Structures are given as C-alpha cells and as structure tokens.
Amino acid sequence: MAMRSHYCGLVTEALMGETVTLCGWVNRRRDHGGVIFIDLRDREGYVQVVCDPDRAEMFKTAEGLRNEFCVQVKGLVRARPEGTTNDKLKSGQIEVLCHELNVLNASVTPPFQLDDENLSETVRLTNRVLDLRRPYMQRNMMLRYRTAIQVRNFLDKEGFIDIETPMLGKSTPEGARDYLVPSRVHDGEFFALPQSPQLYKQMLMVAGYDRYYQITKCFRDEDLRADRQPEFTQIDCETSFLDEEEIRAIFQRMITEVFKTQLDVDLGEFPMMTYQDAAFRFGSDKPDLRVKLEFTELTEIMKDVDFKVFSTPATTKGGRVVALRVPGGSQISRGEIDQYTEFVKIYGAKGLAWIKVNEVAKGRDGLQSPIVKNLHDAAIAEILKRTGAQDGDLIFFGADKEKIVNDSIGALRLKVGHSEFGKANGLFENRWAPLWVVDFPMFEHDEENDRWAAVHHPFTSPKDGHEELMVTDPANCLAKAYDMVLNGWELGGGSVRIHRADVQSKVFDALKISPEDARAKFGYLLDALQYGAPPHGGLAFGLDRLITLMTGADSIRDVIAFPKTQRAQDLLTQAPSPVDEKQLRELHIRLRNPLAATQG
C-alpha cells in the first residue's frame, strides 16, 4: 500500500466520500469537547483531520501529538459541518475523519512558532530547516520551482538547448573578486568559480550551438546588499544570428508569459529608454517608473549665481545641478527634511538644499528657504518655471559631481516616492513598471587608476559606427547593451558580443590590457573568434531577483532555500569554517594567521 495517496492541501470536495492516506506535520492540535482536531500541513497546504474517541487506540495516539510531529493519517473525506467551513483554504469545505493514525517521527519543541511573523533573520537562518516549513517560505519555493519549469519549457519551444559549462574555470581579475579554488595537482595554481558563463557560452556560439541556455549558479566575492548573494542563480542565454531587437523580443515575451501564468499579471508594454535619458531624468540606469518624480536640469542657469554650492559644480567639468520638485511637499516637516539630508550623505552628498514654495505669484517673497537670499531673481524665476512649481510644493536640489548628484538625488527620489507621504499624495503608482534601458556607454573612466573600464564587460560590441570612438573618444562610445528593468530592479542584462578578433583586440587596447596580458588571459577566446565566429548576443536574468519581485519578499534571502547572510555566512551549517591542517598541506597552503581562522 502506498504511504500517501494525496497531498493535504489538495484534498477538496472532489474527493468527498473517498478514503485518503495523508502524510504531513502537525501544525496545530485542538481538543474540543472530547473530539481532537488536527491541522495537518504539507507543502501544498492544510487539511483538518478529526479524531473521534470511538476509535480508542487512534484517539490515544492523537492525544499525544504535539506541533511538528510527522504523522500518517488514513481517513474518510466528508463535508465540514455547517458554519465551520474555511474559504481561505483549498480544503476548507471538507475534513478528514481519521480511521488510522501513525506517528512517523516525534518532534522536540521547536524554538519558535512557525506562524510567528516577527522572527529575526538570525533565528530564521540558524533554524532554516524549520523556517522552510513555514507556508510563506513554501509558497516562495514553489513559485521559484514553477517559474524555472516554465522558463525551461519556453526556451525549449524556442529552440534553445541546455548545455552545462564548467564550475572550475580560469580567474579573470578585471571584474568583481573571484572565489578561488586551489589545485592540489598543480601546486600554486588556482581555479576560479564562475562569475558568469560568459566566455564559455560565446565559444558555444562559435561551435555552432546557436541557441544555448542554462539555469546555473554564479559566484562573486563582493560586498553584500539586500539583493546580492555570494552565490546566485542565473538564467543564462545566448543566441547567434539575431540582432538586439530580436533578442529583446524573445525575452520580453518570456518574462511576460511568466508573469501572466504565475501571477495573472499583464505587464503590458515595455517602454524603451536610453541610458543617457534614464540618468538625466532619474539619476539611475534602472529607474523605478512607479515613482512620479523627475529631475529638472539646472546646471546652465546656476553658472552665474553667487551661491558657490551651486555655481562651483555648475562651472566645473563633470559637475551637475538638478532640482527635484515634490508636489505638495511643503507639508514635509523640517525634521523630516533633516532626515533626508542625512540620507543623501550616504551617497556622497555634502548636504541637501531645499525651497518650500508657499506662493508662486510672489516670487522670492513667496518662498521659504535658507538659500533664497543667495540666488538672484532671474535664477529664482527660472527655477520656478523649469520645475513647474506650484503653491505648496517642495523643491530639493543636488549640486556636485554628476555621479554624486545622480546617486544621491536618485535615491532621494525613491525615498520620497515610496514614503507614506509619497503614497498618500499620488507620487507613487502601485503597478508593475517594466522597461528596457538601452545604449549604455561602452566605457566608464576609472579616476583612481586614470584608465577606461568596461561598463558591462570587455566582450560587449560597440554600436554600429562607434568602433573608431573606442580610440578617439571613448567617453562617447556607446555599446549594443540592454537591461530589462522592473520596478527599479535590474531583472536581466545583456548585449550583442564582439564576434571579430580584431575588434576584440581593439577593446583590450582601449582598456589598456596589453597584447601579452590579453593573450595570457583570453587567448582561447581570441583564437576561437578567428574560426568564422557568428554574430551573437545574449542576456542573463537573475532568478533570485525575479522571484523576489514576483513574491514581494523583503529580502532575496526569502526566495533561496539556503542563503548566506550579509556577512557571507551560512548560519545553518556554520560555513565558512576552518579546515584540517592536513587538507591545507595537500593543497600546498599555509595560513599567515592560523589563530584568526580558528576564531572566525
């Protein structure tokens, strides 16, 4: 006889009158007037089990049950008595009258109630096995599974083939820090865990596998944030003989179908925005279009004001001055403005200038701000005109290097838009807001090392007609790169790749990678590109981020079964941990500070 006939959460009226065998965990046991009720739980949900004292042996077993006991129940599906149904459950119209009850395994008292919504992340991650039993986590894991299956089916129908690429590869230190794996066989040499399968998938294109994908782990040893993990899962795709528009069309359709099937959400149109436009209007390459606030450019009109806070960046190369008008913002208190001032300092801003607009018609006299006295009438009039200010508005200002202004005022835009004030005053639209950001710069200037660095990676193709700009004007060289953005999150990013060895060598030269270094690090790619490499490009989605957005989870750690903390630790297994001296000797490794390793 099968140990189980049905999942608990899938027992419905369709099984009325049938005998079922269920396995699961005791979520709750209730004793009501001599009858014991058990809420039995498995990954699909709950079912109510009724234990009647008429079956003495079974009833005695039921009396000994406690939360999280693992049990097997055999019983009759029947309708719940009138007035006791639960419309919130799939099984809420029925109950199972227990005939047989077996305890498969007892449980010690759990360290927390599974329905406790106020657990610290440390408690949850230390007791991850129990945390994963919670319905919230099980819903997340099931959505992740269903999404991955749908993605695989979609790509299969589109002619993509799943090919695995190596986990142990060559270190290329130009990007983020690698996770290194020492070789026991080759003394003093190391593998690197992949930050992405980028070069392998390009070589698969050269090899003729014109539509490739895999759902794979990638690794980056970088500082963690709420949406970052040292190991993460990527939906990695590459195609040959498709241009940018065709690549974007395929993957827009994939994401649109996933949201419709899994969430019954129509994402609608994906507007297209250039990187320059996104940075100019929102200070970000992944703008959250739900927030209805935009920058107003003021750099030109601030060049001749006496206020050096504005005039200095306005007249300095690479400087920028912008305004952010907050409709109705004059009701924001001085204390809240002070909090916003401290907030923008996180992003390098020295402070936050502001003007409250009490009465536009009065010009200077209708404004409230400590900076008004430093601005001439023409500048004030132009600020009010360009921002479209109205009575009751608040205007914030950012003035500094362009990056600091974009980062700080861009973050302020989101902070205000997502605040209670923003939501109450129509500054935030509760909707899904997808878009494509295109025409990224090919290079960005590394001021510390006085050299150009690749914005995405050095294998991205320049836009048509921009190849010579790599040498003559790298600041204005644009790339065939594109990001899919949703609600201010980068869901996926990709590009058309360089498929000619001579162009790839030019990019290495622009990045000041010598021919010798290029040959040592990427010789296998340069060689492959000489064998009739096809035009190719691709895109990769972060599966963890995608599921975080779809579930509305507060943290990416809520959609990963066994995540790391923000200190890159696994609290369940206590990884990383010291290793045996013998293991180190076999790897020809000696620790500089053995005591530090044992102390963590």
UniProtKB/Swiss-Prot annotation:
Compartments where located: Cytoplasm
Aspartate, as annotated region: 198-201
Main location: cytoplasm
SUPFAM superfamilies reported in the protein's UniProt record: Class II aaRS and biotin synthetases, GAD domain-like, Nucleic acid-binding proteins
One annotated GO biological process: aspartyl-tRNA aminoacylation
Chain positions recorded as L-aspartate binding sites: 174, 220, 456, 497
Gene Ontology MF, one: aspartate-tRNA ligase activity
Annotated binding of ATP, by residue: 220-222, 229, 490, 542-545
Catalytic reaction equation(s): tRNA(Asx) + L-aspartate + ATP = L-aspartyl-tRNA(Asx) + AMP + diphosphate
PROSITE patterns: AA_TRNA_LIGASE_II
Keyword terms of this UniProt record: Aminoacyl-tRNA synthetase, ATP-binding, Cytoplasm, Ligase, Nucleotide-binding, Protein biosynthesis
EC class (word): ligase
Pfam family, one: tRNA-synt_2
Site (Important for tRNA non-discrimination): 32, 83
Keyword check for Ligase: yes
Family: Belongs to the class-II aminoacyl-tRNA synthetase family. Type 1 subfamily.
Subunit structure: Homodimer.
UniProt xrefs under NCBIfam families: aspS_bact, PRK00476.1
Job description of the protein: Aspartyl-tRNA synthetase with relaxed tRNA specificity since it is able to aspartylate not only its cognate tRNA(Asp) but also tRNA(Asn). Reaction proceeds in two steps: L-aspartate is first activated by ATP to form Asp-AMP and then transferred to the acceptor end of tRNA(Asp/Asn).
Protein name: Aspartate--tRNA(Asp/Asn) ligase
Species: Delftia acidovorans (strain DSM 14801 / SPH-1)
